[in-house]
Amino acid sequence: LFPILCSFGRYTVPVPVAQTIVARALLGSQFAMPNGMITLGAALRREADGAIVCSFTPYGRVADFVLAQDGDALLLLPCAAAQREASGVHGSLAANLRWPDERIATHVPGAGPLLPTFAAALHAALLSGAMTRVFEMTLKHCNDRIQFGKTLGKFQAVQHQLSVMAEHVAAASIAAEAAFRTDTTTPSLLAAAMAKSRTSEAAVLVASIAHALHGAIGIAEEYDLQLLTRRLHEWRIAHGSEAHWNALIGNSVLASDASIADFVRSV
């Protein structure tokens, strides 16, 4: 599954195919699957008038349903019944969704706590795929672009930036893939947390170096780099940035009697 999810990130698929795969896994074979695309709600809250709100929902503008955690249960909410408001950066498909009446939601017991784990692993894979392509585009640009009589890649400062970028892309990809190395159908919470933390941390650096080395062409609408880097920033904060997941990892370390090395080996 990891290579497939990476490819969705690499080619910036503009519909929640990856989220639908994960949502159907969470709903399980006992549930009658709805027709249409399902995205994962990053947060759910109830308002005083009984309305349900899912803020900054990835792909909320194009999804047919939202699957969100509600304590120990899941809620499946039809987007056609929601009030949608676009959110996120320019060109983002994220949206704030509000359902005036809770009765339209389908209650699915039991799998609620698994959604954040699946979402973290999913977005780590998407980030890994997108970052790999950003690095490849940047490397090609530096090898093709001639400035002051030689290609950009011949300048030592540029080589250093590319090396730093390659290091973070490789580390993020290893962390993301590790979240999928399991004998069970459910990813480990700690492995998913580490994957999302590492990929989110790398996303900012990779995007900034890519735009620094590309110059103005990097933000041109006709050039695909901006499609990828906008999604890097969006996926970085989706379902928790590195700060959120680092807190979970840190609390787990403090609660463990093992040394740091043994703790890492046990994940």
Where are these regions (language model features)?
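Alpha-helical interface subdomain recognition
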Residues: 1-11, 115-267
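FAD-binding core of flavoproteins
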Residues: 12-21, 25-136, 140, 263-267
